[in-house]
Each structure stands twice: as structure tokens, then as C-alpha cells.
Design a protein with these regions (language model features):
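Short loop/turn segments that connect beta-strands within beta-propeller blades
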Residues: 2, 63-67, 109-114, 148-152, ...
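Surface loop/turn motifs at the tips and blade-to-blade linkers of beta-strand repeat domains
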Residues: 14-24, 73-81, 118-122, 157-162, ...
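Repeated scaffold domains used in trafficking and secretory/extracellular systems
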Residues: 23-32, 81-88, 122-131, 161-170, ...
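Conserved beta-propeller blade signature
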Residues: 39-42, 96-98, 135-138, 175-178, ...
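Short loop/turn segments immediately following the C-termini of beta-strands
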Residues: 44-47, 101-102, 141, 181-183, ...
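Structural motif
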Residues: 49-61, 104-108, 143-147, 185-191, ...
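Loop/turn-rich, solvent-exposed surfaces of beta-rich toroidal or solenoidal domains
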Residues: 78-104, 161-192
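Blade-level signature of beta-propeller repeat domains, shared across WD40, Kelch, NHL, RCC1
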Residues: 128, 213-255
Length: 255
């Protein structure tokens, strides 16, 4: 049953910067804002289209204004069984955790992409580091888990929303935000989970994010990645949709 929530439109939409191919950006997945370094870490699934032969999954390090790729971590060169990459996050020590969905693993790497460790978890998509407890929040197809860094599950919340995917943790308000939607020609959703009650509820209907992927909130601004080119979605562009949460647009009115 769909609770009432705001239907919102992006205040700003930016194309993702190009990698090997011109004018298509890249197939974006997880999104993490590194506030120390002031740039975004973005998962790149490593295929432009579903029928490309092999995955070349990497993490792209992208300028705050999404203008250029500053650097990358080519995960596929280190992990030969790796297929796509989904969520990415960093812990306080600067090391990186990522969801290797096709391998059913959460991988732990350094900033050069070298392996530190991994643990097994079925179908991990979203991940967020919790600096309050030095643990990880991981979203799968059926559950939200809180895990220690060695993969021991400390808390399980059953969540099953169609197309649930990526996570953002708001430590201050003890809330998890997650993206959901797999229509590609219709609405996508942002849900919250109140970690005090473990209750999930829809917060926003995103009217113009057709191929929703990673999400993050920085200074009251919601960033939503869309890999529309890969999915041939209603808007078939790899882009970031930017929503000003203190100036919510409830009808089309692009800047």
C-alpha cells in the first residue's frame, strides 16, 4: 500500500563525464561523497550495454560538479571473477568497501584497489559505513543488514520493495535512505528506514529518475544517479539528478 509522499522533480540534471566513449558517460551504480577529499566515488558497472561481452567494473573518482573523472580504481584488473560493481563506501581509515553483486561478496580494498579482504553475502547492492559503530549497513534483495567489518551480521531488517538498490546513512538522525524502482519508464522511489523502529516507508516519488541507482545527500541536496543509457530508459542518458531538499519542486520547472 503506497503511503502519501511528495512527488518531486530535479532542480538540476547533469550528464556524467565520459570515460572511453564520447557523450555517453558510464554505467553508474553506487554513489559515495568523500567529504575529506571533496569528490564523489561512483561505481562503474563496466558495461555500456547489457549485451557487451565482459564487465570491466571500476570505481570512478569524480569532481564535485561532475565535470570530469579525476581518477579511477580498475577493480576488474585485480579480481578476475568480478562482474559488476554496486554500492561503494569508505570507512574512517580511508579504505573502500564495495558490493560485488555478481560474486555475492562485499570486498574491502585500499585506495589503489589492492585487496584487504572480503566476506560473502547474497546479492549485496547498497552499502554504507557507520562511523558510530565501525560497522557496515548492506542492502540485499530481501534484507537490510548491519554487519561488522569481518561480515558478522549484528542486525537484520526484512525489507522487500521492488527494485530496492542503493543506500545512504544519515547518522545524525539514525535513518537509512534507500533507492527503489526498476520500471525504467515510470516512477522511482526514495524510502527511509527509521533505525529505532526498523520501519521502512516511502519518502519521495522521483518523477524524472527513470533508471535510479546510487543516492547520497550532501548539505540538504539529494544526488541521484541514473544509468538510463544502459537500460534504454525513458531518459536514456547516464546522468545525475539533483534535488534541493529545501526547495523541493513538485512539478516540472527545471532551472
Amino acid at each position: 500500500e503506497q503511503e502519501k509522499c511528495d512527488k518531486i522533480y530535479a532542480n538540476k540534471i547533469l550528464k556524467l563525464p565520459d570515460k572511453e566513449k564520447n557523450n555517453v558517460g558510464f554505467t553508474c551504480t553506487g554513489l559515495y561523497w568523500d567529504k575529506e577529499e571533496e569528490y564523489f566515488f561512483i561505481g562503474n558497472a563496466g558495461k555500456y550495454k547489457p549485451n557487451d561481452k565482459t564487465f570491466q567494473a571500476s570505481i570512478e573518482i569524480v569532481e564535485k560538479d561532475f565535470s570530469i573523472i579525476k581518477g579511477d580504481i580498475p577493480c576488474y584488473l585485480k579480481f578476475e571473477n568480478m562482474r559488476d560493481i554496486q554500492g561503494v563506501t569508505k570507512s574512517i581509515d580511508g579504505t573502500i568497501w564495495l558490493c560485488s553483486y555478481g560474486e555475492n561478496k562485499v570486498r574491502h580494498i585500499d585506495e589503489k584497489g589492492n585487496e584487504i579482504g572480503y566476506f560473502d553475502i547474497k546479492e549485496p547492492s547498497g552499502i554504507a559505513n557507520d562511523s558510530r559503530s565501525n560497522t557496515l549497513w548492506i542492502l540485499t534483495n530481501n534484507y537490510l543488514y548491519n554487519c561488522s567489518y569481518d561480515g558478522v551480521v549484528q542486525k537484520t531488517v526484512k525489507i522487500h520493495i521492488k527494485g530496492q538498490d542503493q543506500l545512504f546513512l544519515d547518522e545524525k538522525n539514525d535513518l537509512i535512505y534507500f533507492s527503489a524502482g526498476a520500471d525504467y519508464h515510470g516512477d522511482s522511489y526514495i524510502y527511509t528506514v527509521d533505525l529505532k523502529t526498523n520501519r521502512a516507508k516511502p519518502l519521495y516519488v522521483l518523477k524524472d529518475s527513470y533508471a535510479i541507482e546510487g543516492i547520497t545527500i550532501v548539505d540538504d541536496v539529494l544526488y541521484v544517479l541514473n544509468d538510463g543509457y544502459y537500460h534504454d530508459a525513458e531518459t536514456s542518458v547516464n546522468q545525475v539528478n539533483i534535488y534541493f531538499l529545501n526547495k523541493i519542486q513538485t512539478k516540472e520547472n527545471y532551472q
